C-alpha cells in the first residue's frame, strides 16, 4: 500500500541482499499534488512499537523517532473493548510505554490475583461465579424445602388413602366372613339332617352274599323279598348288588394276573 506524493526510505541494514546494489538509500518520488498531508514513513506503519517489546529487539529504532506515541497506538487498538474492562485492566498510567526507543518492557498486570495464578484484573470475573453460587444455594434450599413439603403432603395424602382402603377392605372382609358364616349355618342343617352311613350287619351281608352266589343279577321280585326280609330298602339292595358285581370283576382280574404270572399253577 502506498500513498501519493510520499517519500519512502528503505534502510540498508534492514533490507540487504547479495543480489541488490549496495546503495545507502532509495528515494522514490511520485508526481502527485503536494497538498495531500504527509503520513508517517512506511517503517513506522510496518513496524509498530506498542511498548511491549524490548528496544534492543529492533536495531533500526535507534536512528528513527516514532511518529505516534505508544499511548495513542494503544488507545486506537483498544477502542472496541469495553471501558469498564479497560479501567480494571489498565489501572496505572505507568503501565504504558511513552517512548518506544528507550522504554523498558511493559507489564500489563503488576500483581497476582486471589487465585495465585491470574493477575488482579481477573478478580472481578472470579467474584461473579462465587456470587452466583451463593445466590444459587439459597434458591436450591428453597426449592428443596418446597419439594420436601410437597412430598410430605403427598405422603400424608397417600397414608390417609391407604388407611381408608384398609378400613374399606376390613369392612369387606368382615362382611364376607359374616356372609360365609351365614352360608355355613344355612348349609350345616342339611348336612346334619343327612343320615349317617351305617354298615350292613353280618346277618344282612350273609344273606346278600348267598343270594349273589346263586344269582349275580337279581330281579325285582327277589329284590323286594330280600328288602322285606333284611329290613332294607329296595334301593339299598340294588346298590349292594351293583357294588358286589364290580368287586367280583376286580377279584377275577386279580386272579387271572396271579395265575398267568405263576406258570406252576
From Swiss-Prot:
Any one Gene Ontology molecular-function term assigned to this protein's record: RNA polymerase II cis-regulatory region sequence-specific DNA binding
Composition bias, Basic and acidic residues: 158-168
Keyword list, A-Z: Developmental protein, DNA-binding, Homeobox, Nucleus, Transcription, Transcription regulation
Presence of keyword Nucleus: yes
UniProt signal peptide: none
Annotated family: Belongs to the Abd-B homeobox family.
Protein name: Homeobox protein Hox-D11a
Gene name per UniProt: hoxd11a
